[in-house]
């Protein structure tokens, strides 16, 4: 994914302004306390990958990123990022080549994050809040990182900055899966004064997207499980899957306040098949969040985030009660989360945040508290030069 400081800001260019190389590093260390596994770890009752998820409790590396951007000259550049979450192995989050034939156009090919807007794209990692928003988790299995080609257009018209993006993707990650011929994405955004508005659409047509049976477990993965002929501990979906989203952000130039909101709609239509039967499935999952931040003083901020996720699911055919039991769909209850955050920013690139919250899904509720240390260095070489000149 287009990560590190630049990508998590959602809009900044990760390539150096002039020909040369930039190396950056960013990370978040977290200690989270909760009396039991958080409901969002598995999101029971929602159709997802069906894995055991990542246990957020205890002390762990929430996210670490080492990235490098290389601008060959005005038109060509390359970017790569290596990331790590918790005990998961390190993985390539981004590896792409970019061509900019002019000031307005850019063509990016390789592994990257499809454009979803200034609110949705960066939400969830190196964020102000510790946990990935429920709506983003349910729609994309946390983050959408994919291999493909994306064409972008940027232009200032009057007092507004316009953005358009279109992408073609391999589509093997959730909500795509095996057999996806090609996934499509479209994004449009406008920034005018204090406000930014974004909308996006994504379309997948998997022929073998798997979901592990509720009792099968399995390690955490961003990819959709691959179906096989045996269908052992697996339920397979074949059909159309779409995600639509819209978001808004307000960054006041006059007040120490900011606010944002996002809504995502994930729609599935197609057959579900397992050893126990075949059913026609229709699922509509709608979720979103609102967030507000008050900069109490230059080094202190107070924030709150409210979230809700709900789903309407229809399953018809022979043996559908057994399929629903395999998937744990009978455990469905609307999910919600509320969190309050106090942040201390002692210097640029360093933040300490205390967060308390509560969340519910699948019929149970859990409180949690987290202490996080987040750091980010855009340009390691420049930081070292600055440190050497300091008295």
Predicted regions and their residues:
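Hydrophobic alpha-helical segments
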Residues: 42, 76, 88, 107, ...
């Amino acid at each position: 994914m287009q990560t590190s400081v630049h990508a998590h800001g959602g809009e900044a260019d990760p390539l150096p302004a002039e020909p040369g190389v930039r190396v950056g590093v960013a990370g978040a260390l977290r200690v989270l306390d909760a009396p039991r596994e958080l409901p969002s770890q598995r999101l029971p009752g929602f159709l997802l990958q069906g894995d055991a998820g990542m246990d957020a409790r205890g002390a762990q590396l929430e996210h670490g990123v080492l990235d490098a951007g290389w601008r060959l000259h005005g038109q060509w550049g390359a970017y790569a990022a290596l990331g790590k979450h918790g005990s998961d192995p390190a993985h390539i989050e981004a590896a792409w080549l970019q061509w900019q034939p002019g000031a307005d156009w850019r063509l990016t090919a390789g592994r990257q994050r499809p454009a979803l807007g200034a609110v949705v794209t960066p939400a969830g990692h190196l964020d102000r809040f510790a946990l990935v928003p429920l709506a983003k988790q349910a729609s994309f299995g946390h983050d959408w990182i994919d291999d493909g080609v994306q064409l972008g257009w940027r232009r200032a018209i009057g007092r507004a900055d316009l953005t358009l993006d279109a992408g073609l993707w391999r589509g093997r990650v959730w909500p795509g899966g095996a057999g996806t011929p090609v996934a499509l994405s479209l994004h449009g955004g406008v920034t005018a004064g204090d406000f930014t508005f974004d909308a996006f659409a994504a379309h997948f047509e998997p022929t073998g997207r798997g979901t592990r049976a509720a009792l099968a477990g399995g390690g955490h993965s961003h990819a959709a499980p691959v179906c096989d002929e045996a269908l052992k501990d697996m339920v397979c979906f074949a059909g159309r899957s779409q995600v639509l989203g819209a978001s808004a952000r307000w960054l006041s130039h006059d007040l120490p306040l900011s606010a944002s909101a996002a809504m995502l709609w994930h729609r599935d239509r197609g057959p579900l098949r397992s050893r126990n039967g075949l059913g026609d499935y229709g699922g509509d999952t709608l979720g979103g969040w609102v967030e507000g931040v008050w900069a109490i003083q230059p080094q202190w901020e107070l924030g709150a985030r409210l979230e809700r996720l709900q789903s309407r699911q229809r399953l018809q055919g022979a043996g559908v009660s057994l399929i629903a039991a395999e998937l744990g769909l009978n455990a469905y209850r609307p999910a919600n989360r509320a969190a309050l955050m106090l942040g201390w920013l002692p210097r640029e690139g360093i933040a300490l945040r205390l967060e308390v919250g509560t969340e519910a899904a699948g019929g149970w509720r859990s409180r949690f508290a987290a202490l996080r240390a987040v750091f980010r260095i855009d340009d390691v070489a420049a930081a070292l030069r600055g440190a050497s000149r300091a008295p």
